[in-house]
Amino acid sequence: MKYPPVHYHDYLGLNPLLNAQHPKSTEYGKPAHDELLFIIVHQTYELWFKQILFELDSVLSTFQKPTVAESEMGIASARLERIVSILKLIIGQVDVLETMTPLDFLDFRDMLYPASGFQSYQWRLIETKLGLRIGDRLAYNQSPFYKSLSESQQGEMLNIMNQPSLHDSVEKWLERTPFLQGENFNFWDSYKEAVNKMFQDDITTVKNNPRLPDEEKAKTVAGLEQTLKSFDALFDEEAFNKLRAEGQFRLSYKAMHAALLIQLHRDQPILQTPFRIIRALLDIDETMTTWRYRHALMAMRMLGQKIGTGGSSGHKYLADATAKHKIFGDFFNLTTFFIPRSQVPPLPKAIADRMSFHY
């Protein structure tokens, strides 16, 4: 045998794992049956957070390279998709926790002060490494989020906050996307023409519709013209950067263009993996938002208007965080600039050939 035998129990470290639950209600001589469930669900969250961080660190190391090989992109995409699957799984764990009734929870809740899920170092690491900036977070008890962590964790978190996040690294990767402009082709010139033609055709159709009253025509045309105006930022870098400075965009002008190109031409072989990566990042943001929302609903169900054990406003804080804590919002907002696939300008043959595989 090449390696010495290993026992299942020892390999999984089950002795320390299964003896890591220490209910406070038992310690205080007032055993509450559901406290063990409460502990195990939260310990399971932390185990899954550890796996998410393991996958996330791998993806970060890939995208922080000056160039990313196609094979590495496939691996990164698969690991991001694994993170999505884990996040969906932990959302399902809320169902298990909700088998505990509010009265069951009150049997031991007062014994937990001031412990709070807000103190989860691993969850804060996940958010920060993905790219949730301190300015995009809700203040917690009028203090920065990291102040709820232990002193050693605060130092580590401040160090992580000063390093490039996945959002930062993906932005730089997008900026390196080729194909946006060729020797005799500028994608954005052709896309602008297609957008203008689509809206002008719609405006002409409305104006020539004999069944619409003049007032309705004017209102519809004004709406179409306003929507067309929203595309200005896409074609005017100065206008885009002004909106970006106001916080309406986070990605750079070049990165936004690349992300839109990938979405519009995702069926091209060379863009299929980049599209999977963008979709996985969207899914991560969405599932994290869903998990926060389920957490907020559970807090309302368990606590009503009571404050949280960590001193927060409970349900209200969680609901507000659900609405505010977004990371890849620009990818969601890209759909603003979509036009029907039938009207997307075709790529020149030379560029389409470069995007394709040949045998």
Curated annotation (Swiss-Prot):
Co-factor binding details: Binds 1 heme group per subunit.
InterPro entries (alphabetical): Trp/Indoleamine_2_3_dOase-like (IPR037217), Trp_2_3_dOase (IPR004981)
Obligatory cofactor(s): heme
Keyword Flavoprotein assigned: no
Domain of life where this protein originates: Bacteria
Catalysed conversion reaction: L-tryptophan + O2 = N-formyl-L-kynurenine
Alphabetical keyword list: Dioxygenase, Heme, Iron, Metal-binding, Oxidoreductase, Tryptophan catabolism
Pathway stated in the Swiss-Prot or TrEMBL entry: Amino-acid degradation; L-tryptophan degradation via kynurenine pathway; L-kynurenine from L-tryptophan: step 1/2
Residues annotated for heme binding in this entry: H295
Any one GO MF annotation of this record: heme binding
Keyword Membrane (UniProt): no
SUPFAM superfamilies attached to this UniProt entry: Indolic compounds 2,3-dioxygenase-like
Gene3D superfamilies: 1.10.287.3810, 1.20.58.480
EC identifiers of the protein: 1.13.11.11
Stretch forming the signal peptide: none
Swiss-Prot/TrEMBL GO biological process terms: L-tryptophan catabolic process to acetyl-CoA; L-tryptophan catabolic process to kynurenine
List of residues binding substrate: F38, I39, I40, V41, H42, R109, T309
Family as reported in the entry's similarity comment: Belongs to the tryptophan 2,3-dioxygenase family.
Function according to Swiss-Prot or TrEMBL: Heme-dependent dioxygenase that catalyzes the oxidative cleavage of the L-tryptophan (L-Trp) pyrrole ring and converts L-tryptophan to N-formyl-L-kynurenine. Catalyzes the oxidative cleavage of the indole moiety.
Subunit structure: Homotetramer.
Protein known as: Tryptophan 2,3-dioxygenase
Organism: Bdellovibrio bacteriovorus (strain ATCC 15356 / DSM 50701 / NCIMB 9529 / HD100)
Gene (name only): kynA
